[in-house]
Amino acid sequence: MHSDDPQQLELLRVCRIGRAQGLKGEVTVQIFTDEPEYRFAPGAVLYTKDGEEEYVVESSRTFKNRWIIKFEGIDDRDASEAANGVVLYGEADDPEEMLEADEWYPKDLISLEARLAEGNTLGLAPGTVVGKVVDVIEVAQWLLKIRLANPVKDADGVVVENSALVPFVDELVPDIDLEGGYLTLDPPGGLIPGL
């Protein structure tokens, strides 16, 4: 994987190797991907952050909501214990293919302008700038943190609300235009302060 080419593929964090599982080299992993079936398919290649070491998936399985992976060359408990704590990365998908498939990474949404959607339920002018996406928070459901273009102030002019959390679902975020640098929102009343 190591390359002196400055245009080498971007690596995304996929997992952290955890405890040894059994005696034959299997390990548990803490996952950081929403595509574990793809990332842990037999033959999939993962890398250390510097791209110097490759870890090839030999087999994978789930047990009680945990992924258990067997990597090529890690064949006993000693080798699996030695790998504990190693963080592995995978190659990012091709950006052009992702755009065609209407897919994106959370980091791609940060800094997009948030505008009101056409025909929004609030009845406000479409295209009205609500703010800018400053973070994508992953809890039970992804949330977009939007810094408001017009912060809400109290009677004394002190800012009391300068951001809003919007669930990242199709109904509330109907359009994303990465090339145009914006996304549209169709929030219900009360979700975004000041609207």
Curated annotation (Swiss-Prot):
> GO CC terms on record?
cytoplasm; ribosome
Q: Which UniProt keywords apply?
A: Chaperone, Cytoplasm, Ribosome biogenesis, rRNA processing
The keyword Protein biosynthesis belongs to this UniProt entry's keyword annotation: no
Q: Where in the cell is it found?
A: Cytoplasm
Superkingdom classification of source: Bacteria
Keyword Cytoplasm among UniProt keywords: yes
Could you state a single Gene Ontology molecular function term? ribosome binding
Please list the residue ranges annotated as the PRC barrel domain. 101-191
Share an example GO biological-process annotation for this protein: ribosomal small subunit biogenesis
Spell out the InterPro entries in the cross-references: PRC_barrel-like_sf, PRC_RimM, RimM, RimM_N, RimM_N_sf, Transl_B-barrel_sf
The record's annotation in NCBIfam families points to:
16S_RimM
What is this protein's function?
An accessory protein needed during the final step in the assembly of 30S ribosomal subunit, possibly for assembly of the head region. Essential for efficient processing of 16S rRNA. May be needed both before and after RbfA during the maturation of 16S rRNA. It has affinity for free ribosomal 30S subunits but not for 70S ribosomes.
Q: Which family does it belong to?
A: Belongs to the RimM family.
Question: What's noted about domains in the record?
Answer: The PRC barrel domain binds ribosomal protein uS19.
Quaternary structure and partners: Binds ribosomal protein uS19.
Protein name per the record = Ribosome maturation factor RimM
Gene this protein is translated from: rimM
